[in-house]
Amino acid sequence: MENRPGSFQYVPVQLQGGAPWGFTLKGGLEHCEPLTVSKIEDGGKAALSQKMRTGDELVNINGTPLYGSRQEALILIKGSFRILKLIVRRRNAPVSRPHSWHVAKLLEGCPEAATTMHFPSEAFSLSWHSGCNTSDVCVQWCPLSRHCSTEKSSSIGSMESLEQPGQATYESHLLPIDQNMYPNQRDSAYSSFSASSNASDCALSLRPEEPASTDCIMQGPGPTKAPSGRPNVAETSGGSRRTNGGHLTPSSQMSSRPQEGYQSGPAKAVRGPPQPPVRRDSLQASRAQLLNGEQRRASEPVVPLPQKEKLSLEPVLPARNPNRFCCLSGHDQVTSEGHQNCEFSQPPESSQQGSEHLLMQASTKAVGSPKACDRASSVDSNPLNEASAELAKASFGRPPHLIGPTGHRHSAPEQLLASHLQHVHLDTRGSKGMELPPVQDGHQWTLSPLHSSHKGKKSPCPPTGGTHDQSSKERKTRQVDDRSLVLGHQSQSSPPHGEADGHPSEKGFLDPNRTSRAASELANQQPSASGSLVQQATDCSSTTKAASGTEAGEEGDSEPKECSRMGGRRSGGTRGRSIQNRRKSERFATNLRNEIQRRKAQLQKSKGPLSQLCDTKEPVEETQEPPESPPLTASNTSLLSSCKKPPSPRDKLFNKSMMLRARSSECLSQAPESHESRTGLEGRISPGQRPGQSSLGLNTWWKAPDPSSSDPEKAHAHCGVRGGHWRWSPEHNSQPLVAAAMEGPSNPGDNKELKASTAQAGEDAILLPFADRRKFFEESSKSLSTSHLPGLTTHSNKTFTQRPKPIDQNFQPMSSSCRELRRHPMDQSYHSADQPYHATDQSYHSMSPLQSETPTYSECFASKGLENSMCCKPLHCGDFDYHRTCSYSCSVQGALVHDPCIYCSGEICPALLKRNMMPNCYNCRCHHHQCIRCSVCYHNPQHSALEDSSLAPGNTWKPRKLTVQEFPGDKWNPITGNRKTSQSGREMAHSKTSFSWATPFHPCLENPALDLSSYRAISSLDLLGDFKHALKKSEETSVYEEGSSLASMPHPLRSRAFSESHISLAPQSTRAWGQHRRELFSKGDETQSDLLGARKKAFPPPRPPPPNWEKYRLFRAAQQQKQQQQQQKQQEEEEEEEEEEEEEEEEEEEEAEEEEEELPPQYFSSETSGSCALNPEEVLEQPQPLSFGHLEGSRQGSQSVPAEQESFALHSSDFLPPIRGHLGSQPEQAQPPCYYGIGGLWRTSGQEATESAKQEFQHFSPPSGAPGIPTSYSAYYNISVAKAELLNKLKDQPEMAEIGLGEEEVDHELAQKKIQLIESISRKLSVLREAQRGLLEDINANSALGEEVEANLKAVCKSNEFEKYHLFVGDLDKVVNLLLSLSGRLARVENALNSIDSEANQEKLVLIEKKQQLTGQLADAKELKEHVDRREKLVFGMVSRYLPQDQLQDYQHFVKMKSALIIEQRELEEKIKLGEEQLKCLRESLLLGPSNF
């Protein structure tokens, strides 16, 4: 571990003897991951060379540097004869003692594992997708993580697990780049991509289920968190320290946090001495240490809260800590360490949070929210169930300061941490958002573990009460600071991510994209967060923003900022200390890891991966929850009091701002944990100090609980239930959550459940198809661009500052309502997969009351776990409903703040996790949950009621719950139908709830245009295909039927318009829209249906709030009647045309679908996602039934998507993988909700279109690996057919665009989406052109080889024999080209036939005749090919007589590659042609649309 995990060594490898070379490649540019060796055949040439290893990344072949294209590498390798010279890059991971007992054990059994052991550091130093090669990422502790978890929910193993869950267990035995090495995954580029993506994301502990990983993550917080200084002490103390920590921690914790901020002697001293890490220290330390460097820096400045605050908070903390320790008492060693570690590590925690956040973000990236959950849950469920759970609790369940070090130390590899810190810092930007979810995960689990810690010891609750009293007083005296502190303490004591998260959230806002998330996560886990929060509190809204920005910067490389900002509290020394502590903790990491991993392994063996994840954590939480429940009540009251009440206008504002912000971040990152822990911790911690702080983190949902005075009881009940929920059964989650939904305080529990469920769903989602994962990875890697996210985050930050006031009044009740709604069936369904949805709901809900508090969206994310549906509700809240801008900004924020999945209660979307996607990949997309945010829309009608009865959560929740339930069910079903999209996993999870979103959904959709847009962005392709088809019918039926019920809320009709109005923040305008829509609805269902179809068609693009929404809204209001009239007329015609086209396209797509299934969607599989983004516009343009049947058959339904939409989807799909990633991440983030503003249309058509796009593109996507298949004509033919289909559709698209786009004003969002899509397609085209150039070089090289062979033959052969050879080579070229040409023409004719109207008999006859002719010609060409093949044998026999073996091999290679290269060239040309046509269509549509706009 002395070598930096990030260091590489380049190894020259020379293989001789000709193909086969005995190794398999995976990854590549096509899959957005490094091109690595996934398998080495035993006894093969590669194995005999003894130089190549699994996981090695190819950087040079035969002197030709690789740009990462797998296709290029395959061509070069196939072009190599006799000798293959490679240069591979592998991580320098010196062999070092295993980081855990598991590793050691594995190594004992597997010598290979021992050799691989040097990789653990690599693995832990996972190279982030953003910054490192996935091959490096794959290097996670293979033996440990692989061995520890065979679950499919492992972060890295999500794909791998899918492919070979069994192998996941042995992956660790594979070489350092374990994931890349998976032989089973080798051929699945997607798998490689996904696994690699996951691996890099969670290199530390990619597999939540993996004991090692989880241990690393969860144990990380252990003493290993020496960087924090105190953690070491705590760690050293071990169990006794735990008890000690109980007492020490309160003051230490408090002081530690301030010390973190101030780098006080105590904290530093503790931090400085690397105490022998308690076992979890090793794992935690690796993570925490890695995180320590960053988080410490970020954390220490963060705690500039006055010493007074420290003291006052410390008293509270002591009470809380004793509670905590009481709870942890049972798990004294783990918990004690975790506590003390966290407590003392608070500054490190901040740092750690930075790095952890980066690390976790990496983990979360790959693992996603579920992964983090899994990780935590893994810890809990492992033999360390108690210790590990306690550890998780201590590290995760502990207050963030405790948790931060512990939770962040989960990864023991300190070297990894060092490199990770670097990587993390690099990735912080992109990973921060992701980090938050991991932290969230960790914290969720942390909270759960914390609760577990408290589970046996309800003393924490009583102390919490005391603390609450103290905290209330303190908060009143120093509310702002105390709140920050409280936030920090909440983070510390009860992983109140809100607080910690709130602080980082502020940071995150500064560095909106990843900083928001990372900051949230950092804050979640950094006691320092309290300091920064304190500072934020001190600074209040202005400082909050600044702190947010500063902390955001800190998160990544902003640690210096925070240092400067916090008065340089944190300095490089902290980081140095962090590194030193890391090393020391690494020394002790083995012990902790061994014990934790051993226990985890036992637990994992005893329990299923899911049950382990769920049960371990859940049971702990269950026990803890009840104890926490009473404090929860107190906490809720306090929180509500503190947030709602009086702490002081400024404190209140700050609290809200901080809480909202923290909540957005914290809930985003810690929503589940926070919900879980917060329910208990908040109950526990909130009673005194937490009221304001809890409000910070739990403000939204705590307020919601607050409205119900019985919240404590509910919390109790919920806690109890939640314990049950936390069992990982979606049903359990759903049921308790339903009850919890009704119960205010249970919301936190619900969130936990949601989180657990989400994690579960995440695990399921992790099993998403490789193509989906790959798409997600591409999105995350390509569209990881944090530019959009930062902006959104910034918005969130601002909004948060604004929204604290409204949140007080509206947000709380809304939260309750939303929470209830979310907890109900929707929660049940979405708890696993729908948690993100809830987050969205919650965000929206929060937004609703806080019209200008867009951060509520983030906040919603923060309190998302509790108020996922709540988010929806707050959005629905009258304010939000009409303050569409806020809600939109929230949704945008949420989408942008993707960092934690909007729907995943701040965690990375389980779906994303399941896909091993990065949060930046857009959880929204992951979850078609933004649609749920739409529940805000459909709650619009209820909105006023909700607003009016905001204090009556039951009322609002029920309607919204129904709405959410209704919408998600259908929505999810479509998603489920779209198995190809990355949404399939979570789609299924989400579709669990058979919500009939018909009536409520449409209104929701209207308001939730944002939500929908997010959702659409999430799985534009799937959604578009499915939603389009289903929405067209369902929307016409249900929306129009709803029209009567929604007449008052005609939003569905003009969901997007309505969204815009809302986005304009003009409730009146929105209402005017609503009235106008009602008028439209009243005009007639037919007209409405036409209008709806037209509008949805007309407003296909998700609409992120345009910059000038006011102007847009006014413009729309001015043109609304005219547009409606025109749309009514146009739509009637358009619908007729589209119906016909859809029928045709259905046939075509069915064909394409069949073909697609046969074809490997390599370029287009991920592109199909992109298509989704394009499709959303078209989908919106064309409403389709939302029936489950349609959704499930959305893939077929997508075929019914208008040709324009479909072709558009196809085109975009073709080149959309990057686009989708790009759109998904940026556009989705920038305009997630609006994207699906059409509501029903959005869902059904979104899924349909998305799916159709996916399918078509997958159809079109030629087998990327076809280059070496010279005679794969059938496959190519299928591809050609699909492409021809697409081309035909593209030809029709301009007309469609004129009808649809021309007929409807082109939304600003649509234009932006199209622009982004154009950019994405352009990037894809650039990659294809580059590949084409490389292919041309290969062709030239092969031609040169042919000339050489010809010269050699000419010298030795007879003239007539040489002439035979010459003719054969020429005929081979001609025949191959002829076959390709005829197959392509025939495919186009067939596509034309499929798309032709049944009435056009004459044209059909012509096409049939042409088809017959081409079929005959193709048969002749095949005969010619067979003849040429026979001649080839004869020529070979002749040539073999004259040429020596070497030259004969050259001849064989030349002949083989000649046809293969021709086919490959043709495929690339067609792909490029398709991309160019797509770009042309998009540009034309951009020109067409605005004219009518």
Swiss-Prot record:
Annotated localization: Cytoplasm, Cytoskeleton
Compositional bias (Polar residues): 234-243, 249-262, 513-547, 782-802
GO CC entries: actin filament; adherens junction; apical junction complex; apical plasma membrane; basal plasma membrane; cortical actin cytoskeleton; cytoplasm; cytoplasmic side of plasma membrane
Tissue expression from the record: Expressed in all fetal and adult tissues investigated. Expressed in adult heart, brain, placenta, lung, liver, skeletal muscle, kidney and pancreas. In brain regions detected in cerebellum, cerebral cortex, medulla, spinal cord, occipital pole, frontal lobe, temporal lobe and putamen. The expression is strongest in the medulla and weakest in the cerebral cortex.
Pfam entry (one): PDZ
Residue ranges occupied by any PDZ domain in the UniProt entry: 10-92
Coiled coil: 1382-1488
Positions of transmembrane segments: none
Region (Disordered): 202-282, 430-695, 740-759, 781-813, 1117-1170, 1187-1206, 1214-1236, 1246-1265
Keywords attached to this entry: Actin-binding, Chromosomal rearrangement, Coiled coil, Cytoplasm, Cytoskeleton, Developmental protein, Intellectual disability, Phosphoprotein
Domain ASD2 positions: 1213-1492
Comp. bias (Basic and acidic residues): 470-484, 498-509
Alphabetical list of CDD domains matching this protein: PDZ_shroom2_3_4-like (cd06750)
Modified residues (Phosphoserine): S411, S729, S1019
Record field: compositional bias (Low complexity): 1118-1129
Biased composition (Acidic residues): 1132-1159
Molecular function in Gene Ontology: actin filament binding; myosin II binding
InterPro entries linked: ASD2_dom, PDZ, PDZ_sf, Shroom_fam
Disease: A chromosomal aberration involving SHROOM4 is a cause of X-linked intellectual disability (XLID). Translocation t(X;8)(p11.22;p23.3) with FBXO25.
Function comment: Probable regulator of cytoskeletal architecture that plays an important role in development. May regulate cellular and cytoskeletal architecture by modulating the spatial distribution of myosin II.
Quaternary structure, from the entry: Interacts directly with F-actin.
UniProt family annotation: Belongs to the shroom family.
Protein name: Protein Shroom4
